Amino acid sequence: LELKPNKREITIPMPLVLISTLSKNGVRNVAPYSNVMPILRPWDLIAIFSWIKRDTLNNIRDTKEFVISVPTADMVNETMVTSKNYSPTVDEFEMANLKPYPSKIVKPPGVAGCIAWMECVLEKEILEENKYSIIIGKIVRLEINDEYVNKNGDLDFEKAKPAVMICGNRGMYFTFPKWTGEFREYSEMFLNSKDPLSGGDADEDSGVR
């Protein structure tokens, strides 16, 4: 079955995140995005792909700051509220009944109750013929909800249930990861069986890993 361009998105499960920003007048905005991806390892940069006419993009251009929050699958209803095309003067936290999670470095808050929060500053914008924008953000702080960290220091994804979206012909299906029982170390991807980025945990006293 060959798929036309507007049907191809049904083939790839996509992450669901909430991006929160402040307008230059201080109005809080939050919007769902799935077209996001980290830029290689170590995870210092993240890319967001956006339509041109988005309040999120305008706010990032104006303030150079944003927060990416990773919601649980239980937050789909609130997420859908933020997907609507409200006026830029509307506080979307209030519309979706979302509580802010205070940031430590940037001004926009994250979304409370999420799995993780990435505080970001604008590194670069790549504008493609005024059709879409690629936002490159530098992660200046990343915090994970302690509730979802297992004894190995990994994300307990079956407990956290990070929301995943799969597009269909008439709408979106939401699900979350389930472990298959398979685990592979990063070193298995290298011929010398050494992961060049494995440096161990950072200073535990600082709370940074």
For every predicted segment, state its role.
Residues 1-209:
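Basic, polyanion-binding surface patches
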